[in-house]
Amino acid sequence: ITWNDLYESLSLMKAELAEWFPYKLLQVDEAEADDIIAVLVKTLGERALILSSDKDFIQLHQFNVVQYSPMQKKFVDGDAKWSLHEKLIKGDVGDGVPNILSDDSVLVDEGRRQRPIASKKLSEWFGIAPELFCTEEMLRNFNRNKQLIDLNDIPESICINISKQYRETIVGERKRLLTYFINHRLKNLTENLSEF
């Protein structure tokens, strides 16, 4: 299988989901999935279940959100404010974001390691404005991390585009699902139609 084959399959799948299924499917330029989820959670004001193992979403738990991890098969717990504080200070290696004591390239330069941050410092800095404990370089790195990690820091133009697309997206009719499942010989799904 080639990358072109993969992208063609994904495009076909997205088109079919948008046309046949009773769900809104959003793809917004310059927005990642977590940006879209964050904007919708905050603007719709409804109870939400986020189905993801990504701990970045813990920062949204303050917005009437619960999160379930399908990998761990359990609900994700965590304090929204502490989780955001911890990621802003310690970075997120999985997303390529270094801690505030390390420069931008530390995670990509082979053989280099981040400068460690003691748990005691992390606790001491909680709830304090970064300007009060950061050097100039640390503050620059803190602001870098805030821009990359904080789901409250999504650029306004992206937020507007997400909200606009959500309002304008038309969903497929639920009654068309049976036709889709039959045409694609999806017998198991046909038997569980009510779950859609």
Segments from the language model and where they lie:
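Short, amphipathic C-terminal "tail helix"
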Residues: S194-F196
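Extended two-metal-dependent nuclease catalytic cores across DNA- and RNA-processing enzymes
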Residues: I1-Y180, H184-K187, E191
